Design a protein with these regions (language model features):
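Conserved helicase NTPase catalytic core signature
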Residues: 51-215
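Short beta-strand-loop-alpha-helix junction that forms the active-site gateway
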Residues: 547-580, 598-602
Length: 652
């Protein structure tokens, strides 16, 4: 047996010796001198043997020679093994970046200073192009009268047409031709002089003659949700092309006394397209008949996301792009009326509170425009009358009321007449309530009970740019709605609840923890320099990568850091990426700092020094606006009243 074992060992040793450089005698000497020692050491390290074998397998499985070399260097170095994964990833990223730079040399030219200059040049060129476009349009439509159709200028003046007719009418002092005659016999010359006309459907029907459809190259119907198909037909028939613009979630055509029995009684009823009869607006009909359709998603009006958050979720399926404000606040203030009394369409205590708030707004925010909206015309008239009385002793109120049809005027309107208007601050009177304090609340809410009630509310909730002052006699839990309640009543109750809570579930302003390595790096460096940052600041479909809080006012953001990652690259057009987004943020009060990953990759320490220096400069220069909200809520500004306690119109 010993002889067999020796023979087997000799055979295996010979096989091993054949793989080792040198003569067999050398191997035999090595075996004789060191074999026992090697075997002893292996036995002592047997617990690490399996790990060593696994390591050799992993080294052999590395796909690239450079990666295997790096692994061997790490094994031979004194670097802590806990750092090996980061060092390995860093080496892989560095090698791949080098390969990418070799393949695309322009990447090596991207530096922050150059990119900033390019973006400024691009923005300026874009602005110049828009100015040139406007100038080109003005030049194109500025026609000399001699270049327009001259028409008939001989014979009887009653037979004059085109420019001859216009010139003849322009020198008259009396006995002018009716406008319809002018449009009929001088239409071509008028379109030559003034190619763009703005008219209502009623004006088109009453003044313009019948057309063959070639009067205008293009007709644009705005606020199309409020126009019925029959009113739009005469407008559309006069143009070669039509663009219909409107919001299907806003006011439908409104005629409180409209009846649709005429079509039903018609002898031709069977030939009428039933879809037309069922459409409530030209917008609804056009969205089915015309293609393509485009949905505009960027929301500009609200300077605070809380003003549009409710509508975005309930009416627009959270599809709007809402840019965040640079101040963390809820911009809707609720004023609950004490002892409300709603009788015959008017809530007098609510009228009084609305007027008090209007006066306080004028005192606290004289720079802001102001509008008042009530749920019905009776309430709006009552508010307007009381404000008119108060204006007798309040000069600024009188000045605002006298600015009729001006963008700075103070308007008081019922809900039905407010679409298309906007003001910095909107005071809303919800009007409805119990007939006596503590009494039952009947579920009679006027037009809100109709199928389109929620659309009316959407108009109401989206008129403000800066703030909403909600004056109400109701709490959301007082509206015990039946299972059959329509969308208008449900939206009304939910909005009251939204204002009471100060958030709307997923649509409230969000922040998150840093997730990407870049965010973690910048977040940590900012913290070590004494600044606090929030990641992913925003409301809906647009989020700022990192927003740095003002150290002296934590509710204000000092700076928005915008990177060049997925958020930047999500924009399809350079205009969006490099101009419009930043323009919108700056209009909302943000200071925007653009971060370029190439610079941060090469020199993170230098980039953080530049960023911190910018933050310190802004901290000294940025003026924090005074918060006057608490004064408004507390009523610290006294509403002026007549000195003798009576109304200026009171005969006593």
């Amino acid at each position: 047996q010993e002889a067999e074992a020796a023979a087997a060992f000799t055979e295996k040793a010979a096989a091993v010796a054949s793989r080792i450089p040198g003569s067999p005698s050398t191997f035999n000497n090595v075996c004789a001198d060191h074999l026992y020692k090697w075997l002893s050491e292996i036995c002592e390290l047997s617990e690490f043997l399996s790990s060593w074998i696994r390591l050799q397998d992993l080294l052999a499985s590395l796909p690239a020679k450079a990666e295997r070399q790096l692994a061997h260097q790490l094994l031979e170095s004194a670097v802590d093994g806990a750092l090996w994964p980061d060092l390995y990833r860093w080496n892989v990223v560095r090698s791949r970046l080098s390969a990418l730079t070799l393949a695309q040399p322009q990447l090596s030219l991207i530096r922050a200073s150059d990119q900033v200059a390019r973006r400024k040049r691009f923005a300026k060129t874009e602005d110049d192009l828009r100015r040139l476009d406007r100038a080109e349009v003005i030049a194109a439509i500025h026609n000399d009268p001699d270049d327009c159709q001259q028409g008939i200028s001989d014979g009887l003046k009653a037979d004059f047409t085109e420019m001859a007719l216009i010139r003849n009418e322009s020198v008259k002092r009396i006995k002018h031709r009716p406008l319809r005659h002018l449009f009929q016999y001088a239409g071509s010359a008028l379109r030559g002089l003034k190619p763009c006309w703005m008219m209502s459907p009623a004006t088109v029907a009453s003044l313009l003659p019948r057309s063959k459809g070639e009067d205008f190259d293009l007709v644009v119907i705005d606020e199309a949700s409020q126009m019925s198909p029959e009113r739009a037909l005469g407008v559309i028939s006069r143009a070669k092309q039509c663009v219909v613009v409107g919001d299907p979630q806003q006011l439908p055509p409104t005629s409180l006394f409209q009846r649709n029995t005429a079509w039903e009684d018609s002898d031709d009823a069977d030939e009428i397209d039933i879809d037309v009869l069922e459409e409530e607006s030209i917008l609804d009909l056009s969205s089915k008949a015309f293609q393509p359709t485009r949905r505009l998603k960027w929301h500009y009006r609200s300077r605070n996301g809380s003003l549009i958050a409710f509508s975005n979720k309930h009416f627009y399926d959270s599809q709007l792009v809402v840019f965040p404000a640079c101040r963390r606040e809820f911009a809707i203030t609720r004023h609950l009326v004490e002892e409300p009394r709603y009788k015959k369409g008017v809530n007098e205590p609510e009228v009084r509170d609305v007027c008090d708030i209007v006066i306080r707004q004028l005192e606290l925010y004289p720079e802001r425009t102001l509008g008042v909206v009530a749920m019905n015309e009776a309430q709006a008239d009552a508010i307007a009358e009381q404000l008119d009385d108060l204006a007798f002793h309040h000069d600024e109120l009188r000045r605002r009321l006298d600015l009729r049809d001006n963008s700075e005027s103070l308007f008081v309107k019922p809900l039905e007449k407010v679409q298309g208007d906007e003001r910095d601050t909107i005071v809303i009177s919800t009007t409805y309530g119990p007939s006596e304090p503590g009494g039952a609340i009947p579920l009679r809410f006027g037009l809100l009970n109709r199928a389109s009630g929620h659309r009316r509310l959407n108009v109401l909730f989206t008129r403000a740019k800066h703030a909403i002052e909600l004056v109400t006699s109701l709490k959301s839990n007082q509206l015990r709605l039946p299972a059959t309640a329509g969308p208008g009543l449900l939206a009304f109750r939910d909005y009251l609840r939204y204002v009471e809570k100060g958030s709307v579930d997923s649509e409230s302003a969000t922040v998150r923890e840093p997730t990407t390595p870049f965010e973690k790096l910048v977040f940590g460096l900012l913290s070590s320099n004494g600044f606090t940052a929030d990641c992913g600041v925003g409301f809906s479909n647009y989020f700022i990568d990192l927003a740095v809080r003002h150290p002296d006012a934590p509710d204000h953001y000092l700076l928005a850091l915008e990177g060049d990652g997925s958020n930047y690259n999500s924009a399809r057009a350079a205009r969006d990426r490099d101009k419009y987004r930043q323009s919108v943020l700056e209009a909302l009060g943000w200071n925007v700092y653009k971060v370029w990953s190439t610079d941060w990759f090469d020199n993170p320490e230098g980039e953080i020094k530049k960023l911190v220096a910018q933050l310190k400069r802004l901290r000294k220069s940025v003026v924090i606006p005074c918060d006057r909200t608490e004064d408004l809520r507390a009523g610290n500004v006294i509403s002026p009243r007549p000195r003798d306690g009576t109304s200026p119109r009171d005969p006593t």
